[in-house]
Amino acid sequence: MSTPHWFDQGSLVLASNNKGKVAEFEKLFEQLKLPVEIIPQGHLNIPDAIEDGLSFIENAIIKARHASKISGKPAMADDSGICVPVLGGAPGIYSARYAGEHGDDAANNAKLLNDLLPFRKNGEAIEGMFVCVLALVTHAEDPLPQIFQGIWHGEILEAPRGENGFGYDPLFWLPELQVSSAELSKEEKNKISHRGQAMQLFRESLQK
């Protein structure tokens, strides 16, 4: 297996201070059996980057470069969110602060439900998708960031269901499984989620 030189360093900074994301990533790396130590940027006192990009890809790269510059280590960043076509793709890159305050899951969910009220017709399903973009940089000025993208299709419920996960998981319905994302275990979710898909592509890149 040919691996990039950064892989031999044995550690990778995860450019996130989101506890839910960090927990999912730690579980994903454990499941994928990758011999890489994941160091959440908070453990290195790295503050959040200013996300001023206009796309998931741009923001993921911004966050990865920020963490790599401060730590001097390779860094991986996740930029993810939920996109609803009838809302023009919103909440999109603003998913974490959709209701105003960053990371207020309850308020974000309530705003999404309220914004969808005019589109609820005769019980018709409203399509939604979770998007995850991972950006990996070997150093802060890496001219060729590696990008891995996962998209998870589903529907938006009219009320929350389930106690697991975080973010919009309680509103994300999987018709083929007849459960919400918040009703899946971490292991079940990681096998099929947007983040799980992107991580699998990352793993495959290490085997090329």
Curated annotation (Swiss-Prot):
Lineage: Bacteria, Pseudomonadati, Pseudomonadota, Gammaproteobacteria, Moraxellales
EC number in record: 3.6.1.66
Listed name of the protein: dITP/XTP pyrophosphatase
Alphabetical keyword list: Hydrolase, Magnesium, Metal-binding, Nucleotide metabolism, Nucleotide-binding
Cofactor binding: number and manner: Binds 1 Mg(2+) ion per subunit.
Binding positions for Mg(2+) per the UniProt entry: D79
Alphabetical list of NCBIfam families matching this protein: RdgB/HAM1 family non-canonical purine NTP pyrophosphatase
Enzyme class: hydrolase
Residues binding substrate, per UniProt: S16, N17, N18, K19, G20, K21, S80, F166, G167, Y168, D169, K189, H194, R195
Annotated GO MF terms: dITP diphosphatase activity; ITP diphosphatase activity; metal ion binding; nucleotide binding; ribonucleoside triphosphate phosphatase activity; XTP diphosphatase activity
Active site: D79 (proton acceptor)
Any Gene Ontology CC annotation: cytosol
Function, as annotated: Pyrophosphatase that catalyzes the hydrolysis of nucleoside triphosphates to their monophosphate derivatives, with a high preference for the non-canonical purine nucleotides XTP (xanthosine triphosphate), dITP (deoxyinosine triphosphate) and ITP. Seems to function as a house-cleaning enzyme that removes non-canonical purine nucleotides from the nucleotide pool, thus preventing their incorporation into DNA/RNA and avoiding chromosomal lesions.
Record field: catalytic activity: XTP + H2O = XMP + diphosphate + H(+); dITP + H2O = dIMP + diphosphate + H(+); ITP + H2O = IMP + diphosphate + H(+)
Cofactor(s) named in the record: Mg(2+)
Quaternary organization: Homodimer.
